[in-house]
C-alpha cells in the first residue's frame, strides 16, 4: 500500500491545501503538455492557469533541465513533471541509459536487474527535473494482434508480470520518482487501438480477477503512487455484458474508477487520465465537456488538458454542480500528497549520477539485454561462421521516426564492423535491390523493426514490409539470419524462416546482444514471455 507521509510531508500538505482557493485547487488537476512552446509562453500561462503538472520539450537535455528549473522557480506550488521512460531515460534523445523494451525485460526475467534498472531510470530522470514516470506498463499481452501493448508489455503471465513490475516500480519510487502503472483495467485483449476508438477488455469479470486483477492488486499492495486508466472498458463489470461495445472507457467510468479501483481494490493514490486527445475518449462527449466528465468520473489529473479552455470549463463545472467542491479538493489533496512523497517542496531536481553509477547503469542494461535474446526458430545452426574481412549485408525493414528516437539499427552495423566484417546496409529495399546486393556477400542479416503504434491501428507487418522480397532472398542466399528488433510475433508471418531470434526492440544494448548471439559470443537464454499464435484447424462460429 501507499507509504505513509512523514510528519514534515503531512504538515506541508495540510498547510498547502488549506491555503488553496477553489481556482488553485482546480489548477492542480491539470497537466499541460506543450512540446513546441517557448519559455515565455509557459511563464505567461503560469500567470493565467495555476496548473499542477507540465510536460514540455527542449532542443537538448541541458536546455530542458534549465527550463524545468526555471519553471519550478516561478511555480507557487512545485510542479509534477512527467515523462514516458518505458525503457529508460534514453527515450529523451541524447541522454541516459537505453534499456531493453519491456517484453525483453520479461524474457530476461530477473528481478535484481529490474530493481537496478528502476534505480537508473529514477536517478537519470530526477537529475534533469523529471519526477513522475508513466511506467511500468502492466498490461497482459494476450492478443498477439493488439497494436498498443506488444513489446511494451512484460508478457502474458500475471504472476511473472506482477513480480517484475513491482521490483521495477518500487526501485523507481525509492529513488525519488513516482511510478505510474498503466493502463487500467488492462489492455492486451482487444486487437484495436484506443487512439482510434474505445477498446474493450472483454474478459468475464471472474477471469479478469484471476489475470489483470491479480496484477493490479500486486502493484497497489507494492505502493504504486499513480495509476493511469486507459480509454478501455470492462463491460462485464460495468453492466454491459449484452452490449459490450456501448460501455464507456475507464476514463469516464465511476463504476471502474471508484467502485472497482478505489473500493474493491483499495487503491488510494493518484489517478491520471490517459492522453485526452485520443478518440477512445473524445468520441464520448463534446470537447467542452470532456475534462468535466473525466474529473467527475474519478480522474485526479487530466492529462494533456487544453491550456486555453479546460481550467475555465472545470470551474464552471463546479458552479453548475456537475463536480462537487469536495471532489475537487479531494483530488487536489492526492496531487499534493504525491508531491510531498517526492519531497518536491524541498528539491525539484536531483544530483547527476556519478561516473560509477553511469557505468553500473550501462552494465545493467547490457546484462539485461544479454539475458533477453530469445531463439524463435533454430532449424539451422544459429552461429554465423564469419571471419574477419567477410562481406555482410544488413537490411532493416521498418518505419523510422528519428525525432522520437526511432532510428535505423546503426549499432548493429557498428558492432559487426568492429569485428572486422565489411558491412553494406540497406533500409527498406525493393526485392530487386535486395537480390542484387545479396549476390556479392557472405551473409545477410535481415532486421525486422516492427514496434507498437508504428503505424497506428495494427501490429502486423505493413507498408515497407510488403515489398521486402524475403522469399527470394531466403531461397537464393544460403546464409541468412533474421532478428526481430521489435514484435516477436513476426515469426507467425514468416513460416519458412529457419533462423530467427527476438531482441524485442531497438535499444543499443539489444543490438549489441543480438550481434553477440549471431557470432557465437553469447548463448541466447531468454524465454519468450508470451504465447506464440498457431495455425489450427477450427470451425468458425457461423
What is each of the regions a protein language model found here?
Residues 1-50, 253-254, 263, 284-542:
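Preference for extracellular/luminal or secreted protein segments
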Residues 28-38, 102-116, 197-211, 279-285:
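Active-site mouth loops of central-metabolism enzymes
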Residues 47-60:
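A short aromatic-anchored loop/beta-hairpin motif
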Residues 53-55, 133-134, 180, 228, ...:
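Conserved beta-strand positions in the central sheet of alpha/beta enzyme cores
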Residues 61-78, 111-127, 333:
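Active-site-adjacent structural elements in enzyme catalytic domains
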Residues 62-79, 83, 89-91, 156-306, ...:
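Second-shell residues forming the walls of enzyme active-site clefts
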Amino acid at each position: 500500500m501507499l507509504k505513509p507521509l512523514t510528519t514534515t510531508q503531512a504538515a506541508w500538505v495540510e498547510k498547502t491545501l488549506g491555503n488553496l482557493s477553489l481556482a488553485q485547487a482546480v489548477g492542480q488537476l491539470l497537466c499541460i503538455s506543450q512540446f513546441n512552446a517557448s519559455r515565455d509562453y509557459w511563464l505567461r500561462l503560469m500567470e493565467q492557469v495555476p496548473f499542477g503538472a507540465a510536460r514540455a520539450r527542449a532542443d537538448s537535455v541541458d536546455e530542458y533541465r534549465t527550463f524545468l528549473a526555471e519553471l519550478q522557480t516561478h511555480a507557487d506550488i512545485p510542479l509534477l513533471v512527467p515523462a514516458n521512460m518505458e525503457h529508460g531515460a534514453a527515450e529523451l534523445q541524447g541522454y541516459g541509459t537505453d534499456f531493453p523494451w519491456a517484453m525483453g525485460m520479461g524474457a530476461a526475467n530477473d528481478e535484481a536487474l529490474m530493481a537496478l534498472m528502476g534505480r537508473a531510470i529514477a536517478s537519470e530522470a530526477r537529475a534533469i527535473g523529471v519526477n513522475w514516470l508513466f511506467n511500468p506498463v502492466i498490461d497482459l499481452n494476450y492478443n498477439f494482434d493488439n497494436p498498443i501493448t506488444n513489446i511494451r508489455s512484460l508478457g502474458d503471465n500475471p504472476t511473472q508480470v506482477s513480480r517484475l513490475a513491482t521490483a521495477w516500480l518500487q526501485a523507481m519510487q525509492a529513488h525519488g520518482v513516482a511510478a505510474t502503472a498503466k493502463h487500467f483495467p488492462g489492455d492486451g485483449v482487444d486487437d484495436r487501438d484506443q487512439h482510434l476508438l474505445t477498446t474493450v477488455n472483454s474478459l468475464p469479470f471472474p477471469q479478469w480477477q484471476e489475470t489483470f486483477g491479480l496484477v493490479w492488486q500486486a502493484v497497489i499492495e507494492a505502493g504504486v503512487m499513480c495509476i493511469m486508466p486507459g480509454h478501455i472498458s470492462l463491460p462485464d463489470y460495468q453492466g454491459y455484458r449484452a452490449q459490450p461495445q456501448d460501455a464507456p472507457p475507464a476514463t469516464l467510468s465511476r463504476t471502474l474508477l471508484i467502485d472497482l479501483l478505489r473500493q474493491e481494490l483499495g487503491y488510494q493514490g493518484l489517478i491520471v487520465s490517459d492522453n485526452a486527445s485520443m478518440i477512445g475518449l473524445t468520441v464520448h462527449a463534446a470537447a467542452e465537456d470532456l475534462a468535466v466528465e473525466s474529473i467527475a468520473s474519478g480522474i485526479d489529473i487530466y492529462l494533456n488538458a487544453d491550456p486555453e479552455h479546460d481550467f475555465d470549463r472545470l470551474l464552471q463545472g463546479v458552479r453548475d454542480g456537475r463536480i462537487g467542491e469536495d471532489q475537487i479538493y479531494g483530488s487536489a489533496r492526492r496531487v499534493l500528497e504525491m508531491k510531498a512523497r517526492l519531497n518536491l517542496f524541498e528539491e525539484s531536481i536531483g544530483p547527476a549520477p556519478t561516473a560509477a553509477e553511469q557505468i553500473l547503469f550501462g552494465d545493467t542494461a547490457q546484462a539485461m539485454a544479454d539475458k533477453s535474446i530469445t531463439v524463435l526458430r533454430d532449424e539451422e545452426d544459429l552461429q554465423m561462421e564469419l571471419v574477419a574481412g567477410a562481406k555482410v549485408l544488413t537490411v532493416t525493414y521498418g518505419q523510422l521516426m528519428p525525432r522520437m528516437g526511432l532510428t535505423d539499427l546503426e549499432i548493429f552495423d557498428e558492432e559487426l564492423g568492429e569485428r572486422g566484417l565489411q558491412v553494406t546496409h540497406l533500409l527498406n529495399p525493393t526485392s530487386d535491390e535486395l537480390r542484387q546486393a545479396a549476390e556479392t556477400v557472405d551473409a545477410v542479416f535481415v532486421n525486422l523493426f516492427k514496434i507498437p503504434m508504428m503505424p497506428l491501428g495494427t501490429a502486423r507487418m505493413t507498408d515497407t514490409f510488403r515489398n521486402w522480397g524475403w522469399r527470394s532472398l531466403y531461397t537464393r542466399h544460403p546464409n541468412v539470419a533474421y532478428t526481430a528488433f521489435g514484435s516477436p510475433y513476426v515469426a507467425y508471418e514468416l513460416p519458412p524462416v529457419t533462423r530467427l531470434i527476438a531482441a524485442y526492440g531497438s535499444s543499443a544494448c539489444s543490438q549489441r546482444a543480438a550481434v553477440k548471439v549471431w557470432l557465437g559470443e553469447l548463448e541466447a537464454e531468454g524465454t519468450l514471455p508470451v504465447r506464440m499464435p498457431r495455425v489450427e484447424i477450427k470451425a468458425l462460429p457461423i
